[in-house]
Design a protein with these regions (language model features):
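NTP-dependent small-molecule kinase module
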Residues: 2-6, 30, 146-217
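Pre-Walker A (Motif I) flank of P-loop NTPase domains
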Residues: 7-11
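Hydrophobic anchor at the beta1->P-loop junction of P-loop NTPases
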Residues: 14
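Walker A (P-loop) phosphate-binding loop of P-loop NTPases
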Residues: 19
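Conserved lysine of the Walker
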Residues: 22
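Hydrophobic positions on the alpha1 helix immediately C-terminal to the Walker A/P-loop
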Residues: 25
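ATP-dependent small-molecule kinase phosphotransfer cores
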Residues: 36-130, 204
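A glycine- and Lys/Arg-enriched "phosphate-lid" helix/loop adjacent to the NTP-binding pocket
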Residues: 107-173
Length: 217
């Protein structure tokens, strides 16, 4: 067991497109934290607070009215602001770890690469909404869109899940570009079976924990 009792709160995010297995592998990640006796809190985006969950419903509910891309972006950051100030930042400040299903990387991938909105808009909103808050490590579950679509074919799809494959191809490329520029983002091959994907997730988080245990040495 690595010695992490005196560590400050940490922020871990898990990213991935539809069908990548985020929920399953967040459970794997959390089991690794449990094994180290780490106090953590799991949350998600959009959402994480009562108000932010209402915004999530607005964002994901299928509707006939055209959803303007900038409206979508602003709603996402409105939900994120509530989440950051009421949940994420306070918990990290008190020393608790936060594990979040998606964060701002998703906005760059979906609204930036997928929707084609200017990245400068996202940069500005990110600074306004979260300041210097950034994840300490991000696990990106990479999966070809056609594989993801097949995995979720039997469930009722939300508004975003109903997008065309070209949209999800752009989202995937956006994530891969982010990973190429950010060493905190670890790419996990989510096309493998559950056991092998879980093994990758455990290896990545255990490596991260070992790196923290040596920070003060």
């Amino acid at each position: 067991m690595v010695q992490l009792a005196d560590q400050p709160g940490r922020f871990i995010t898990v990213e991935g497109s539809e069908g990548a297995g985020k929920s399953t592998n967040i459970s794997v990640l959390c089991a690794a934290l449990d094994a180290e006796g780490i106090d953590y809190y799991c949350t998600r985006e959009p959402g994480g607070t009562a108000f932010a969950e209402e915004i999530r419903e607005l964002l994901l509910k299928p509707r006939e009215e055209r959803f303007d891309n900038l409206t979508e972006l602003l709603l996402i950051f409105a939900a994120r602001r509530q989440h950051v100030v009421n949940v994420i930042q306070p918990r990290i400040t008190t020393g608790q770890w936060v594990v979040c299903d998606r964060f701002t990387d998703a906005t760059y991938a979906y609204q930036g690469s997928g929707r084609g909105l200017p990245l400068e808009w996202i940069d500005t909103l990110r600074l306004w909404v979260q300041g210097s808050l950034e994840p300490d490590i991000t696990l990106y579950l990479d999966l070809a869109p056609e594989v993801g679509a097949a995995r979720i074919a039997d469930r009722e799809l939300d508004r975003l899940e109903r997008e065309q494959r070209a949209f999800f191809e752009a989202v995937r490329q956006g994530y891969l570009e982010l990973a190429s520029r950010n060493s905190r983002i670890r790419i996990i091959d989510a096309s493998q079976n559950l056991t092998d994907v879980g093994r990758q997730v455990r290896a990545a988080i255990e490596e991260f924990l070992r790196s923290l245990s040596g920070e003060g040495h």
